[in-house]
Amino acid sequence: MKNQTYHNEQIVKNTAKLRNVLKDFPDFALDFFTGIENKTSALTRLNYAYDLRTFFKWAVQETNLFRGKEVFDLEVSDLEKFHTTHFERYMSYLTSYTDENGEIITNGERGKARKLAAVRSFFKYYFRREMIKVDLASKIEMPKLHDKPIIKLEEDEMYKFLDTVENGYGLSGHEKGFHKHTKVRDTAIMTLLLGTGLRVSECVGLNIEDLDFKINALKVTRKGGNQVILYFNDEVKLALYNWLEERACNPILVDEPALFTSLQNKRISTRAVEKLVKKYAGIVTPLKHITPHKLRSTYGTRLYHETQDIYVVADVLGHRDVNTTKKHYAAISDEIRRQASKAVTLRK
């Protein structure tokens, strides 16, 4: 698959996973996934399949609606047997349940909202095509989502984080053994994430040919497959250049297109980068639970503070809806709150 882009490889993998999950679905349900194919990604359809599988298993195993039936046996007319109370019970069930592997699964408000959205889309599809007479799933209100504070690295934490990545401060003896082989690569990855706000999937999907050092730019494939050109500063350029110099010394990687590779000489995975961020950030700020997405938030926050232009931030981060950006980055900053607290005095 080396001749394919990372984005295309992921489409192939997710499509294969989707087809495997759909083997246990009722025949009529396949129409839904075919119907939404042109306006959703393979990953979105796969997540829909996972969420709908949970719903169907609950309906067959936890209710009296379909006694003696398996999920595979359901027919489109069975969708009309659901009442609003069934959907409400399902939402309650999602709070905590045991899956087929005996693992306890819990869902907060966001997990419930995502799973309900999948069910509502499913019922809406068949109602619009007049295959069912009523769509009661649409009557169920989505869970109220409470705003979450932006978790990010403060400026001093960011400096310490990069120093830790580069020098291995705080690592165990075992970790230092690996670090001497990966520190240049890790420094390039973390500097790139903090210096551009890339998603972790966009970062690991980069190929060497996507870089242009003449103009300090890189070509990124966004969610949905759109390609954009992003620019980086000289600090990011130096970190990338150092990694490419070291990478060039490994003859095994001559035919490997991926920019960032693992110790197994393959494209590094998103999971591997997540573990690296957790390891280094855990030394600097253990209470914040920093993830690659939090590094993205760090960049977005700093960019907004520097530009005060929410549209620039939305464009650079690849947000399709500027309201998403406004929600997260246009709030009053901690620094402004601190200054405001000193503005009112109680005693002269």
What are the language-model segments listed below?
Residues M1-K348:
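Conserved catalytic core of the tyrosine transesterase superfamily
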